[in-house]
Amino acid sequence: MRVVTIVITLLLIVSFGMLRLGDWLTPADPLPEHIDLIVTFASEQYRVNYSRELMLKYPDAHWFLSDYKNGYSRLLEKNRFDMKRVSVVDTCTSTLAEVRAAAGWIADSIPPEQIPASGSRRPYTIGLISSPYHMRRIDFMAHRYLNSPDLRYVLLPVPLGKYRWEKKTFRYWWRNEFITSITISEFVKIGYFLLTGYL
């Protein structure tokens, strides 16, 4: 009887966890008062456009843009965006590579005096931009590579409405074939990274 009770309890826990999976995969932080660096992952139209909006909102921020064959950076330049505020990398083949590249860029390009001391009320703040369903995996990776008392990162996914999604789109992720596919894919990728020690 005790074994049956344990099994039923575990099944209920797993079932509840799966029901909440979509919400868990899509964390988001509120916009901070300031941002020093905006990091855009795997550039696509919605991510680049939202990042550009944030760059206009935070005029002192720098933009670290992961682009493919410099496609979006050329469009930005064509539209007269101030490219002195943008650093482009087009060599990354994975999200993990992008996080590592951003961490390397910070280490190589930001003078130590520009990064406030530990415990400062205004830490060097990094806004991480991607699609909503990528954010939990990015959070794990950023915790591994951007976890420093002198740095603060915030998760700023492209707002759901820009994709014509709603909060319930991911809350009820099993109702839509595409959302089901990306939800399961992200869950598997997170598990893979954890199991292989990448995080």
Identify the meaning behind each predicted range.
Residues 2-20:
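Hydrophobic membrane-insertion alpha-helices, especially the h-region
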Residues 18, 22-23, 192:
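Membrane-water interface at transmembrane helix exits
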Residues 23-174:
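A structural signal for short, hydrophobic/glycine-enriched beta-strand patches
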Residues 174-199:
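A transmembrane-helix-recognition feature enriched in membrane-embedded lipid enzymes
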